[in-house]
């Protein structure tokens, strides 16, 4: 299957790389290297530079060319590279004409700061493509056999972070009264207060 879809993607990436560099935000999926989308894998296969998170499966880096530059900008609780530093790395390499893949755990727009990276790139006139990833908000319940919605049960679901937002806690009591299924991401540390 890769041969069928690979050639047009490589040609398009080559045409872009010959002029101004670009950035592709690729959602790596929920953890396993086999859970990235085909389009995400194809973007990695044509990357000059891969800027990756700590949450992305390390095996995904094998999908990039051996001569690609790999830059880990992984964040851990309380430490790591700042968002401004990540933005600067993306701008620097794209401005130099490189084809940059920004590999992000899960989906770039589900607590992934993808919009901040796009805004920083746009401020420098750099185009950006987004390739969605499978979010753990959907994958974890599915892999555990837990339906987020079902006939006669929950008709909706809510995804939220377990962390405080703007120094305010969620109204957990109100959320608990809802008939909606709740999916709490990044909830391990604050679990005792949820």
Per-region residue spans from a language model:
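Class I S-adenosyl-L-methionine
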Residues: 1-33, 38-131, 139
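Beta-strand/loop-alpha-helix module characteristic of Rossmann-like adenine-cofactor folds
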Residues: 2-23, 100, 119, 126-129, ...
